[in-house]
Amino acid sequence: AGFAGDDAPRAVFPSIVGRPRYTGVMVGMGQKDAYVGDEAQSKRGILTLKYPIEHGIVSNWDDMEKIWHHTFYNELRVAPEEHPLLLTEAPLNPKANREKMTEIMFETFNVPAMYVAIQAVLSLYASGRTTGIVLDSGDGVSHTVPIYEGYALPHAILRLDLAGRDLTDYLMKILTERGYSFTTAAEREIVRDLKEKLAYVSLVFEQELETSKNSKDVEKSYELPDGQIITIGAERFRCPEVLFQPSFIGMEAVGIHETTYNSIMKCDVDIRKDLYGNVVLSGGSTMFPGITDRMSKEISALAPNSMKIKVVAPPERKYSVWIGGSILASLSTFQQ
C-alpha cells in the first residue's frame, strides 16, 4: 500500500490476521483481540493465524476489513474519506466480490471515489508496455493474462491455483523427508523465509538432480530462529520446480510455461508474435533466480521454431502491480 506517484510502496506486510490462542492474564498490557500483518507475524507463537485472501480472492470479509483498517490508520496514517482509492483484483474475480469490496470502501471507510484495476494489467504498465502477456504469480494464485494495446483479453486469461503458498507447503513436506519437521502456521513462515532466501529454478531439472546427488555444491545452511542450523540441498530447486511440474504436488494442471503458451494460443494468430516477444513476469513467486532462462527455454520448446521469444523479468517485479497502480493513478486523465 502507498501513495500514487511514489516509486515504491510505503507499507508492505503479509495479509494475515492473528487472534490470541490464550486469554491474557496481565491486566493493563493492552492485549488486542486481533493483530494484523507484521505484528501478527512477530507474535505468531501465541496466535492463530488466518489468511483472509485465498487463491487471490477474498474469502473472509471481516478479517479483510481489519487489514484495510490497519492499512489506512496504522500503516499509511491517512483518513480514507479524504483520498480517492485504487484497489486491485485478480483477473476473473467474481463480480460479487468486486461489489462487496466497493460496498465496504464506500460504506465503512467513506472513500470519495475508487477504481478497481486488474493486477496483471498494472504489471504490464510498470514494465513500460501496452502489449504483452503477463505471468503473475503471487501467494495464492497464478494467472497468464494476454494484453493487447492496453486491453486484457478475457477469453484467453488462464488461472492456475498454484503459487507461493503451495511452494512453501511443498518445501515443508520435502524438508520433513530430510528429517526436519515444520507443521504449524508459525513454522510455515520460517519455511517461507527459507524459500525466499535459498530456492532457485534449475535449467534442466533431471541434470541438476543428478549433480546434486554427487556433489555438495548445491548445499546451503540456514539458521532457524532458535539458533539451530539446518542444511538444504536439492530441496532448493525441487521446491520451485512445482511451478513447471504441478504433478509434484498431485495437481493435474500443466506448468506455468505451458499455461503461458496455452494462453497465447487462445489469442488471435496475428497478435501471437507480439505476445511471444513480450512475456512479462510479475509477482513474488517469479523472484526465483533462474526462472527467466527456464521460462524462455520451455516456451521456445513449445512455440513455432522461428519464433522470437523474450521473457522479461523486471527487478522490481515483486511490487510491479503496485508500481503500475502508482503510475496509473497519477495520470491526470485517470483522475478525471
From Swiss-Prot:
EC number of this enzyme: 3.6.4.-
Catalysed reaction, written as an equation: ATP + H2O = ADP + phosphate + H(+)
Localization: Cytoplasm, Cytoskeleton
Annotated InterPro entries: Actin, Actin/actin-like_CS, Actin_CS, ATPase_NBD
Protein keywords: ATP-binding, Cytoplasm, Cytoskeleton, Hydrolase, Nucleotide-binding
Cited SUPFAM superfamilies: Actin-like ATPase domain
GO molecular function: ATP binding; hydrolase activity
Enzyme class: hydrolase
Signal sequence, start to end: none
GO cellular component terms given for this protein: actin cytoskeleton; cytoplasm
Primary location class: cytoplasm
UniProt function note: Actins are highly conserved proteins that are involved in various types of cell motility and are ubiquitously expressed in all eukaryotic cells. Essential component of cell cytoskeleton; plays an important role in cytoplasmic streaming, cell shape determination, cell division, organelle movement and extension growth.
Family assignment from sequence similarity: Belongs to the actin family.
Matches recorded under PANTHER family: ACTIN (PTHR11937)
Extra facts: There are at least 7 different actin genes in tobacco.
Official protein name in the record: Actin-53
Organism: Nicotiana tabacum (Common tobacco)
